[in-house]
Amino acid sequence: MKTILRNLFYTLKRFRTASVLNLLGLSTAFAAFMLIMMKASYEYNFDTCYPDSDRLVMLNFGEEKDNSITLLPRGPIDFLIQQVPGIEYGTIYAPCWQKQAFCTNPENPQYFYETPWAVYPDFGKVIGLQFVKGSDKDMDKPESIIISESYARKLFPKGNALGSYLYTEGDNGLVKRIDKFRICGIFKDLPENCQFKNDMFIRMSDYQKDDWASQNYF
């Protein structure tokens, strides 16, 4: 072992330029390999973070070889959820059409702007959200909201997020005439390689219910 190390250091000392170039090339190749493997792992494991992910089905209109996701009307999605016997839970989801101003204290508002996603009450059951505090059982109430664990820490550093309110201004088609939302559940953060990376989910209103023409939903 000592002989090998001695020869190695002798070679490095004698052929400094070549040794440096070889080490740089090896380091670059290794870094490129790691980046490629990280990207491959990201894509291969995309949307596999959900429990029983192999049982999840997403309705989409398009060509078989087309990888795009199509916005759909609300009517046919609701019809399939209600009429197909094999569907245990179903949901639609859509981002609110504009960023909304929220605050945690209406008396001294420090506004932050977010685009919450509107979902059905069973959304958490569909993708298997893991709640660290509270639950989604109150998501059938229009003023309920669930937020991620990291977002709860950000908004409420004292740890009192559950049961607190987020106050908002403005109106939105997906959530009408609601100026405050009660946090009923805090879920474990979802990984980056999934399509549900949002930190806030609110209950979908009845807007465009039974509409078979407007294409605004997933």
What are these regions (language model features)?
Residues 4-15:
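A short amphipathic helical element positioned immediately N-terminal to and/or at the very start
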Residues 17, 85-89, 160:
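Glycine-centered tight turns that cap/initiate beta-strands
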Residues 36-103, 110, 209, 214-218:
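Membrane-proximal extracellular/periplasmic loop immediately following the first transmembrane helix
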